[in-house]
Amino acid sequence: MARYVFITGGVVSSLGKGLASAALGALLQARGFSVRLRKLDPYLNVDPGTMSPFEHGEVFVTDDGAETDLDLGHYERFTGVSARKTDSVSSGRIYSNVLEKERRGDYLGKTIQVIPHVTNEIKDFLRVGEDEVDFMLCEIGGTVGDIEGLPFFEAIRQFAQDKPRGQCIFVHLTLLPYVSASHELKTKPTQHSVKELRSIGIAPDVLLLRSEHPIPEKEREKIALFCNVRKEAVIAAYDLKTIYEAPLAYHREGLDQAVLDAFGISPAPKPNLDRWVDVMDRLEHAEGEVRVAIVGKYTQLEDAYKSIAEALTHGGMANRTRVRAEWINAELFEREDPSPFLEGFHAILVPGGFGERGTEGKIRAAQYAREKGIPYLGICLGMQMAVIEAARNLAHVKDAGSEEFDHEIGRKRYTPVVYHLKEWIQGNHIVERKHDDDKGGTMRLGAYTAALAAGSRVATIYGSTEIEERHRHRYEVDVRYREALEGCGLTFSGMSPDGRLPEIVEIKDHPWFVGVQFHPELKSKPFAPHPLFADFIRAAVEVSRLV
């Protein structure tokens, strides 16, 4: 039976609960325990799949096709444990489940209420898989006091009451603001946050104090006294140069020991933190630097491409090279010649996205990389833009475009070399889709197998002719243009097992030019960099040596 750690936040949002949860999971693993991490989001969307990247940031996709919060990416990167659909839930999903049960008559005519029906649904979610691991770490999104989060806080309060004593603990992350005029840290916001938490029946066992400045011992003692927490369980959470320092930093501060003490686990197994020491060594002792241009649509918010940024860092680790990623709005290239902006970069990456805005700029970036011999990695829409560029400029399909862009305005302007995907094989059945289907949850989502051409660049990179990668798309390159494009040098080196869906394109007579329909960044980890990103950065290093 799993022990439960509930991670909550107070004072302000975006303090780093997800990273704290991921780091704690990594530390418990380092002591020999098995872990699973979960995220409970209070928003009323069923999932983040239809939310704007500017609202939510990246949508992280799991192997089984769940569209989830980017924190699940942190969980996977830090622990290596693949997330599942059952590791993410929102208020919208909970209420949807409750209302479906009411319509079916599952409640036998009872009046449906937040307590007990909504809270019971949340508790049922928490119980799934509790016999599989030693520790279940559950992060509650938002901050204590948010009206949307109240059912979740009530549910975890009840859940802890239902379990035997010592099976659940609460870790609360707050902010210690620094007042520069008086040169002091203020503890009152933390005290009020804990007071708010205690008022709804939850007493924190461990406090994490986010601070930019050193926390004096007397302030820790004061917080321990007023918040009724052991002084050893008052843990500093300082700002760090890199998120990958978090496991070592939290271990130095005693987080993992405080958690094990709260559970009464003694003597605690000693941690083996060698993998994290190696990660930091590779980051701190990089032997060079490469510049990578990310030509995207949502560049104002880097969280929109969080996994890509981290995967590039991992690729740098694999080559002991520092990666300086620079974000360029693709719309700029629709007005300007990309050459002055892209000169000096050692590689170009065009990530995924939706809609026509910025796509002509991405096409011009792909053309620049192809013509100048600059390493290019196109992901999802980035692959489609590379194909459209090749169709226009090499295969002489002058009006080549995507069916997505015509569908947006309701009239035909392009010859669609990229079309709306109407059916595909998933497991043992065929999935069918129409243009007027609901937007949410209707894309080709999750892990799918691809067959790679023997002798191709990607087969060499992967060391295999069969791979499995995660997808999130509803448009696909039309395989009917394969012959024309391959005749111009663009090889379809990866296909779905049935040969109908192009998964990878590459240019052989180019230092490094690869487009992939899937999202390799979602499977990259600091201690296991994704092979595509590792080789992409290797190619960038080669270019940097020629400059």
From Swiss-Prot:
Any one Pfam family match given in the protein's UniProt record, by short name? GATase
Cross-referenced PROSITE patterns = GATASE_TYPE_1 (PS51273)
Q: How is its activity regulated?
A: Allosterically activated by GTP, when glutamine is the substrate; GTP has no effect on the reaction when ammonia is the substrate. The allosteric effector GTP functions by stabilizing the protein conformation that binds the tetrahedral intermediate(s) formed during glutamine hydrolysis. Inhibited by the product CTP, via allosteric rather than competitive inhibition.
User: GO molecular-function annotation terms?
Assistant: ATP binding; CTP synthase activity; glutaminase activity; identical protein binding; metal ion binding
> Which positions are annotated as binding ATP?
S14, L15, G16, K17, G18, L19, D71
The segments labelled Amidoligase domain in the record are 1-265
The cross-references to Gene3D superfamilies, in alphabetical order and at most eight, read: 3.40.50.880, P-loop containing nucleotide triphosphate hydrolases
Give me the residues that bind Mg(2+), please.
D71, E139
What is annotated as the active site? C380, H519, E521
In the record, biological process GO terms are: 'de novo' CTP biosynthetic process; pyrimidine nucleobase biosynthetic process
What EC identifiers does the entry list? Answer: 6.3.4.2
Q: How does it assemble?
A: Homotetramer.
Further information: CTPSs have evolved a hybrid strategy for distinguishing between UTP and CTP. The overlapping regions of the product feedback inhibitory and substrate sites recognize a common feature in both compounds, the triphosphate moiety. To differentiate isosteric substrate and product pyrimidine rings, an additional pocket far from the expected kinase/ligase catalytic site, specifically recognizes the cytosine and ribose portions of the product inhibitor.
| Name of the featured protein | CTP synthase
The major lineage groups are: Bacteria, Pseudomonadati, Pseudomonadota, Alphaproteobacteria, Rhodobacterales
Q: Which gene encodes it?
A: pyrG
